Amino acid sequence: MIRISLDLMGGDFGPQVVIPGAAKALDRHPDISFVFYGLKEQCDPVLAKFPKLKEKSVFHDCELAVSMSEKPSQALRRGRYISTMWRSIEAVKTGEADVAVSAGNTGALMAMAKFCLRTMANIERPAIAAIWPTLKGESIVLDVGATIGADAQQLMDFALMGGAMARALFEVERPTVGLLNVGVEEMKGQEEVKEAGRLLREANIDSLEYSGFVEGNDLGKGTVDVVVTEGFSGNIALKTAEGTAKQIGEYLRAAMSRTLLARIGYLFAKSAFDMLREKLDPSKVNGGVFLGLNGIVIKSHGGANAEGIAAAIEVGYDMAKNGLNQKIENDLKKYHAKRLPPMGPEAA
């Protein structure tokens, strides 16, 4: 049984969408049980419509919900210990749940997750990993906005964590990893990126295969299983891809409404165009994973519908079932053990 704690008040639509999303996830995975955190008056009427879900869940009434516009520091001060967001994360810390899922304010969620769960040993900064649609299926891109900037060692840690996530999600034995750069040549790019490339080449890690530098146009090609970058560049790439998907959708809509014949053709092809737009948009592959914490936290897109919420829950389900954090901890331990200088008589 995989136990999932769910912030029912997160996102643009709160329990009206989050609860039906949980019901969809339960239909697909009967071995899920839920721990819900919400505001009773708003959640009870919706939950009553899903008796099967109510049976497989425990509901905790909370004092407040974090708004989508609150600053992380304000949310932490106001909502620590008593908000739906905090308590859903705390359930992972206490062992009541295996994974926490929220569609709430990203900054507040990261601040609370870091404060409540703390980072793993040898991890200076957590990262947000996005599942990215590609021509070959899906890949993982991290960091897409947890922190701005990263040194070579932090990029190295991101590579290890991303590789572990790829093994848990895609079930590949040795995922390929690339560093996002302005060119594939070794002499190009910022010093920290070049140094991270050197570290990855020399580390010879058996849990991943370093494929060198990749460029922005490789993101959609699926050139590698994992693309590593720092949060500023990663977030720009994510928002650019989301915007491009919407732009293409608008172009198609405009082109197909210019004449009566085009409008008739659009009606017949609408589902295909919608599928194209969704394929291009990383936000539709819902469920950003916070990596590097002592517990699994999944961030759903705030504007997700019930299907999107279900997808985020399923990402959390897969991560917990396939032992994501154990894989990360093992990989970090092996790598950092190699870096330690020899001790005892052998060192002399």
From Swiss-Prot:
Keyword terms, alphabetized: Cytoplasm, Lipid biosynthesis, Lipid metabolism, Phospholipid biosynthesis, Phospholipid metabolism, Transferase
Location within or outside the cell: Cytoplasm
Any one annotated GO CC term: cytoplasm
EC number: 2.3.1.274
UniProt KW Lipid biosynthesis keyword: yes
Alphabetical list of Gene3D superfamilies matching this protein: Isopropylmalate Dehydrogenase (3.40.718.10)
Single annotated GO MF: phosphate:acyl-[acyl carrier protein] acyltransferase activity
Swiss-Prot/TrEMBL catalytic activity: a fatty acyl-[ACP] + phosphate = an acyl phosphate + holo-[ACP]
Pathway listed: Lipid metabolism; phospholipid metabolism
Major enzyme class: transferase
GO BP, sorted A to Z: fatty acid biosynthetic process; phospholipid biosynthetic process
Pfam family, one: FA_synthesis
Principal localisation: cytoplasm
Assigned protein family: Belongs to the PlsX family.
Quaternary structure note: Homodimer. Probably interacts with PlsY.
NCBIfam families: plsX (TIGR00182)
Function: Catalyzes the reversible formation of acyl-phosphate (acyl-PO(4)) from acyl-[acyl-carrier-protein] (acyl-ACP). This enzyme utilizes acyl-ACP as fatty acyl donor, but not acyl-CoA.
Name of the molecule in the record: Phosphate acyltransferase
